[in-house]
Design a protein with these regions (language model features):
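Extreme N-terminal starter segment of soluble prokaryotic enzymes
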Residues: 1-3
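Aromatic-lined carbohydrate-binding surfaces of glycoside hydrolases
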Residues: 6-200, 205
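Well-ordered, non-membrane alpha-helical segments in soluble/globular domains
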Residues: 24-29, 64-70, 110-115, 154-164, ...
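Short secondary-structure transition/capping segments
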Residues: 86-99, 128-139, 177-183, 219-238, ...
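Short acidic/glycine-rich loop or secondary-structure boundary segments that cap or lie
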Residues: 141-142, 185-188, 209-212, 268-270, ...
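Short aromatic-enriched loop/helix-cap "lid" or pocket-rim segments at secondary-structure transitions
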Residues: 144-146, 213-214, 305-306
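Glycoside hydrolase catalytic-domain groove-lining segments
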Residues: 187-265
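Substrate-binding cleft of secreted/luminal carbohydrate-active enzymes
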Residues: 255-326
Length: 326
């Protein structure tokens, strides 16, 4: 099974463009050491502006990895038993890294840039089994107040662009991997446009699932101030996003979509990893459940390394309890 860790190389996927990467090599070294310790066999590396792309060098920021550095880290990970998977997020709420091209979304120039980058990354990563293309939270209003330009796709345009991006990946011999939002929220339309064999889905659940583990909104100020808190719910898990991901993620897997559910320590919920692995492992068709991922959603730096290690530890503990003990 896949036991994956999401890692940030680039960081310009949110709100503003930083001119310099915060990525720290010392944190990366500790991360890899602990990945081996905790049985991580795959890292999904969010590239963004963190690579000096030959096709579009204008996207790289200070501190971006050279192509030689990417190849060296790919080989380093292989020797550790870790598969390094590239990620490029093309969602309209997470594409600050595309620079001026984000303002050209759904134009011929944009499509060419997307294809150029996907093809280069496929070659650079030695033709990986998967290429993650993001596509989460497209049109999510919570991002609009912070963004300097608000535009997103909907209707047939979003399905056209998702299909195009998937086809770019498939033409490179890889399988496109996406966050499961579009399938979770529009399951019928998704099934019409994207066949079961054309994509890997990651439903993401960052709080508990078992009712006895639910998280009181009033227990933390960050919960009170969150979107869930503003809804007036008593527990974080009552919010539609978590109910939908929990329910539709299982349905999609049992319908035939290959699935890698994602947990996280981001929500500060001590039961998240356990509940996500228990729920999806016990309820999904095992043939379609490829494995699990954890995403700490922090920069790869020494300030955040403890959180990254905790993510791997929680995933390993849940794996031992609910998968290896079976």
């Amino acid at each position: 099974m896949i036991w994956s860790l999401y890692v940030e190389l680039g960081q310009n996927m949110w709100f503003c463009e930083d001119p310099k990467l915060d990525f720290e090599d010392a944190a990366w070294d500790i991360l890899l050491e602990n990945a081996v310790k905790y049985g991580i066999n795959q890292i999904v590396l969010d590239l963004g502006e963190g690579v000096q792309y030959k096709s579009h060098p204008e996207l790289a920021k200070e501190g971006a990895w050279s192509c030689d550095r990417v190849r060296a880290e790919l080989e380093r990970c292989r020797k550790l038993g870790i598969e390094l998977i590239p990620k490029l997020n093309f969602s309209a709420t997470h594409h600050m890294w595309l620079g001026e091209y984000r303002r050209m979304m759904s134009t011929s120039i944009y499509y060419k840039v997307c294809r150029d980058l996907i093809e280069e990354v496929a070659e650079l990563f030695d033709h990986p089994a998967y290429i993650h293309i993001g596509m989460d939270e497209e049109g999510d209003a919570q991002f609009f107040e912070e963004m300097d330009m608000v535009h997103y796709r909907q209707g047939e345009l979003i399905w056209h662009d998702l299909r195009y991006l998937c086809d770019c990946v498939l033409s490179c011999g890889a399988k496109p991997w996406i966050w499961a939002d579009m399938c979770m929220y529009e399951p019928e339309a998704f099934r019409r446009h994207i066949p079961y064999d054309d994509v890997i889905l990651s439903p993401w659940v960052y709080f508990a699932i078992r009712r006895e583990h639910w998280t009181l909104v009033k227990s933390k100020q960050r919960y009170i101030d969150s979107n869930e808190g503003k809804m007036g719910v008593e527990y974080m898990e009552e919010a539609p996003i978590w109910q939908t991901m929990t329910r539709e993620g299982v349905i999609a897997a049992n319908d035939g979509y290959k699935t890698v559910p994602c947990c996280s320590v981001w929500g500060e919920c001590e039961y998240c990893s356990d509940d996500v692995i228990e729920h999806f492992y016990n309820n999904c068709d095992k043939e379609n459940l490829l494995g699990f991922m954890t995403a700490p959603w922090v920069r790869t730096d020494m300030k955040s390394i403890d959180n990254i290690v905790l993510s791997m530890q929680k995933l390993a503990e849940a794996r031992a309890k609910f998968v290896e003990s079976k």
